[in-house]
Regions:
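Catalytic cores of nucleotide-sugar-dependent glycosyltransferases that transfer UDP/GDP/TDP-activated
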Residues: 1-143
């Protein structure tokens, strides 16, 4: 996706990442692609859900990321690549976070409370549309 954006020469205002499968994108956009003019000023929003996975991903994940020349301090959580630690890394490299589920784990909720970026708490489907618009305007684009 990132290379497609580069080929089209289209600089997005916001990139909204959903769930753990895309959770490494904020890290890569801020580090590996950090000097790309197309992403300068781009805001990254990550939505977090309660759909985690059991166990950990490949224990070599940190080695694979270091191969791309990214400083280990940027992904220190990934020494143990669990769902919680992958999402912590996404939060650390996002400009804003949205709680996409009402039942996040206690550990993830506690980490979100300490986040330095704006966090939109969960809203049910009847009210999330306006809440997202307001959040984007005031906290993401207005920040």
């Amino acid at each position: 996706v990132v290379d497609t954006v580069k080929k089209l020469n289209w600089g997005p205002d916001i990139i909204h990442v959903h769930g753990w499968l895309a959770s490494l994108l904020p890290l890569y956009l801020r580090t590996y692609y950090g000097n790309e003019p197309l992403f300068d000023g781009c805001k990254i929003v990550t939505s977090i859900y309660s759909q985690d996975f059991e166990g950990t991903l490949c224990q070599d994940l940190s080695k694979k990321i270091s191969f791309d020349g990214i400083d280990g301090a940027q992904y220190a959580h990934l020494d143990t690549p669990s769902y919680l630690n992958i999402m912590k890394t996404a939060i650390d490299h996002s400009d804003a976070v949205i709680e996409g589920s009402p039942d996040l784990s206690d550990e993830l909720s506690a980490y979100l409370k300490k986040a330095t970026c704006p966090v939109l708490n969960f809203h049910n489907k009847d009210e999330f549309s306006q809440a997202y618009i307001d959040f984007y305007k005031s906290k993401v684009l207005g920040a």
